[in-house]
Amino acid sequence: MELLAKTRKLNALLQSAAGKPVNFREMSDTMCEVIEANVFVVSRRGKLLGYAIHQQIENERMKQMLAERQFPEEYTQNLFNVTETSSNLDVNSEYTAFPVENKDLFGQGLTTIVPIVGGGERLGTLVLARLGREFLDDDLILAEYSATVVGMEILREKAEEIEEEARSKAVVQMAISSLSYSELEAIEHIFEELNGTEGLLVASKIADRVGITRSVIVNALRKLESAGVIESRSLGMKGTYIKVLNDKFLHELAKLKTN
């Protein structure tokens, strides 16, 4: 397969995603096919975002690593020393993707390391490995192109996470601001007693202890529930089951108490 055909194969994968998140496993499979090498997409913390195996490596440690989808911490940290594409590293290199305890079996093993960079920061590493055949310029062009695509995808996911976090925080702040002074006081006492993200409580007991009416507690819970911040369910004489749905809620509530 010529370079242009291989590039088109990678492009076809991106175009088929059509604005949806690129599946790192599918991306790895395609890279594995066009570059003809074992492919590992490694995050900053060593998490295996995606991988594909072209040549099986019979080694228990490697199998466990793939099963856990996690690269060793020391190896991951060492990868940060590689700031530009380093190709055809042999089994004696500290960056080899072959098991060092089996150097005699993988003497012809070659590894290529491609940093994944986006937005001016290191986002991860693309690790390629194969036996007996050097990585040529065409392979490196495809690898660097793939690393750029992966970097853009990681940045997109990070932006979505930040956006979702901001949205969750805004929902909580709006829900809390909709509470009256007595309702806010009731909510503070409820979650002080709950002491966690879910549990069972008796509203009448809290109302008596704090000196507010039960209707204030009911209204406060209803407001938070309609905002999607909590879930509440009456269990009759047993009390009310409450579960926090928005993980920003308790933090924002705690901030109010300290201010």
Swiss-Prot record:
UniProt region (GAF domain), positions on chain: 1-155
GO CC annotation, single: cytoplasm
Family: Belongs to the CodY family.
Annotated protein name in UniProt: Global transcriptional regulator CodY
Compartment(s) where it occurs, according to its Swiss-Prot or TrEMBL record: Cytoplasm
A GO molecular function held by the record: GTP binding
Keywords: Cytoplasm, DNA-binding, Phosphoprotein, Repressor, Transcription, Transcription regulation
Gene name linked to the record: codY
The species this protein was found in: Bacillus cytotoxicus (strain DSM 22905 / CIP 110041 / 391-98 / NVH 391-98)
GO biological process: negative regulation of DNA-templated transcription
The keyword Transcription is assigned to this record: yes
InterPro entries associated with the record: CodY, GAF-like_dom_sf, GTP_trans_reg_CodY_C, Transc_reg_CodY_N, WH-like_DNA-bd_sf, WH_DNA-bd_sf
UniProt superkingdom: Bacteria
SUPFAM superfamilies in UniProt: Winged helix' DNA-binding domain
Residue positions where Phosphoserine is found in the record: S215
Known role: DNA-binding global transcriptional regulator which is involved in the adaptive response to starvation and acts by directly or indirectly controlling the expression of numerous genes in response to nutrient availability. During rapid exponential growth, CodY is highly active and represses genes whose products allow adaptation to nutrient depletion.
DNA-binding stretch(es), residue numbering of this chain: 203-222
